[in-house]
Amino acid sequence: MAKRRQKKRTHAQLTPEQEQGIPKSMVIRVGQTSLANHSLNQLVKDFRQIMQPHTAIKLKERKSNKLKDFVVMCGPLGVTHLFMFTQSEKTGNVSLKIARTPQGPTVTFQVLDYSLGRDIKKFLKRPKSLNNDDVLNPPLLVLNGFSTSKRSGEDDQDVNVEKVIVSMFQNIFPPLNPARTSLNSIKRVFMINKDRETGEISMRHYFIDIREVEISRNLKRLYKAKNNLSKTVPNLHRKEDISSLILDHDLGAYTSESEIEDDAIVRVVDNQDVKAKHSQSLKSQRTPVEKKDNKEREKETEEEDVEMEEPKPSENLQPTPRKKAIKLTELGPRLTLKLVKIEEGICSGKVLHHEFVQKSSEEIKALEKRHAAKMRLKEQRKKEQEENIAKKKAVKDAKKQRKLERRKARAAEGGEGQGKDDAMSDDESSSSDSEHYGSVPEDLDSDLFSEVE
């Protein structure tokens, strides 16, 4: 299969500063119990669809991976948020921990119930599946039920907890600039609603479908019934006039859930229509300056151009708003959360707030002293470990140095021994030659070696 072509020439590339300002996330599972849960695995995959495109969509966890392994990689990869799904071995409760890297804090929620995306599609009449174009931009974040101002009957601690949660949710997606953001690029919405009475937080993920509305819904049903025989015609025997059918809003109760509601119809100004009207007005204002007779025009050559007047800008050109209907289709997953605690750091630090456990000031001071003693002991052990490592390294380096010196000494001794052996071999060869030629008599007749004539 051929690889799909990507736009490179006209696509706007982000600068390194802009890429650094975009928040990125990782959605992972931590713990042996959570890795063995198949439904939780599918929930993690569905939650990654929400966080697209700035998330690790194809991340695979191993049983040997620990939380520290992911935290270490957050810095080089530029990850700003960690979403950790865990499951307790004793109770089996599923928890969602949202941590801000690298300093924290970490907000822990208990997942009361959740529904997967495939379960939601079974109950929808017209389910929607996401394409690659639908996840090119992050979803629109909508927060409802959260208040950062102090109300009557609320403590300062509750207000601070609310501020931490709101700031945590607001920073998981890049901020929108109304002047630069195109409305057509926003195709998804992530809704987070808090119930003020129970304190439960519900998460929903929807797809935004915008359709143009030119006629009323009742007339559209009549047009569809004309072209499609399977569509049922509304019962008109109780209607006196056709206007009663058009103006009757109670007829909408008999339509399906997937159709667009009248309350969702808004008026939107489209810039493309303004540009089109402006171009049409310019064309209509263009008139020839020189009017010649037909005989003179026939004599002119084809190379001559007819001079045109400069068009005047139309003062009465105003954009006409169009009616557009907004329809939301749920994609999933659904989550219902309950706040448990807020702690410093990434899953290891001082507990700033706990929803179910309340400590007195004396208990808090005792815990702080115990924590300080643990930190001092940890630093002491760390220093001892570093000193031991340095000692072992020094011993190892000294051993290597002695080994190199022995090798050099052996090489030098081997060179001297080889020189002595060569001298002894030369003496032996010279003595053997003298002994061989010494047995030849001196008065040997020289005619034996004379040349033959």
UniProtKB/Swiss-Prot annotation:
GO terms for molecular function: rRNA binding. Residues 1-11, 399-409 have a biased composition (Basic residues). Keywords: Nucleus, Phosphoprotein, Ribosome biogenesis. Residues 26-348 form the Brix domain. The modification Phosphothreonine is found at residue 301. Residues 288-300, 374-398, 410-423 have a biased composition (Basic and acidic residues). It is found in: Nucleus, Nucleolus. One of its GO terms (biological process) is regulation of cell size. InterPro entries: Brix (IPR007109), PPAN-like (IPR045112). Residues 442-453 have a biased composition (Acidic residues). The keyword Ubl conjugation does not apply. It holds the Pfam family Brix. One of its GO terms (cellular component) is nucleolus. It comes from the Eukaryota. Residues 1-22, 275-324, 374-453 are annotated as: Disordered. Present with 8150 molecules/cell in log phase SD medium. Part of a complex that includes BRX1, RPF1, RPF2 and SSF1 or SSF2. Required for biogenesis of the 60S ribosomal subunit. This is Ribosome biogenesis protein SSF1. The lineage of its organism: Eukaryota, Fungi, Dikarya, Ascomycota, Saccharomycotina. The gene is SSF1.
